[in-house]
Amino acid sequence: MWNYEKRLQYPVKITRTNPKMAQVIISQFGGPDGELAASMRYLSQRYTMPYKEVTGILTDIGTEELAHMEMICAIVYQLTKDLTPEEIEKYGFDKYYVDHTLALWPQAAAGTPWTATYFQSKGDPITDLSEDMAAEQKARTTYDNILRLIKDPEICDPIRFLREREIVHYQRFGEANREDCSKIPKARKTHKFSTFGKSLSIRTFAGHRHEPPYLLLYLKMKIIHEIGQAAFSYN
């Protein structure tokens, strides 16, 4: 259950319309690295996260991403509020206007509609947290790109705040990922087999209820590394 407060997480007070910049910023509403995809990613992943501490982090950050989406929508709304037909045509906002008038609709800067394919939820803690860390860096890069294009301090101020929060989220997911990796038990058995004429040693884990994901991850990395070295030596 969420409690909604009738205020933005960070103030958005834009006094000058700018539909050209609105078309850029809207990407952080419905683009591939936007806040809508981020919130859906984390709030979906939390159900199959095996560790309560990390589930809490996913819930916290997923909830905050909803607040960030609200901020982005407020920015776009204030940048396009009460536009005249002349302004809409002058700044190239006509294509969006035809389909949505001045309503908010999730799309990327290029006009691509939002899609659930922008995020994954795999049910494996390392896989999901790795995606989460990458997602936060991609969002941070997108905000960097926006700040390179925008000079208005009224717009830059909330965008900088959002960028800073992406860095904090990345750090929190990194800490969670390290905590997950520390739960991998020590190896107990060593299995040997040959490939490309080389002998490989694979140590497996036992006595852990999440053994399969970690075991498969370790096996994949080990086999790819060893086979790659073997193939290189035969060329």
Predicted regions and their residues:
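Non-heme di-metal
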Residues: M1-R209, Y214-K222, E226-G228, Y234
